[in-house]
């Protein structure tokens, strides 16, 4: 079932997808490995990260992805450029 994305949230969701993709790559993870660590499907990760796409997803999924990336969910939401302390902070 596809969810309609509020126009006001579209840019935020796109930016969130970019942040997830950027940090995933920085961590050296494939979409498949991130999906496995987060307990979600690879196709969901792919749709969240898809350039120019605004994929709506649950807060539970956001928390699972942020845990898998060893970062606070708030840092993903607020990210446009990650400070060095976030990139280097691995559990």
What are these language model-derived features?
Residues 39-55:
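Recognition helix of helix-turn-helix/homeodomain-like DNA-binding domains
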């Amino acid at each position: 079932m596809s969810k309609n994305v509020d126009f006001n949230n579209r840019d935020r969701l796109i930016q969130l997808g970019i942040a997830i993709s950027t940090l995933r790559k920085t961590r050296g993870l494939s979409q498949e490995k991130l999906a496995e660590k987060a307990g979600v499907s690879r196709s969901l990760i792919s749709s969240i990260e898809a350039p120019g796409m605004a994929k709506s997803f649950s807060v539970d999924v956001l928390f699972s992805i942020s845990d898998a990336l060893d970062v606070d969910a708030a840092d993903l939401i607020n990210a446009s450029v990650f400070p060095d302390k976030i990139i280097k902070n691995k559990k």
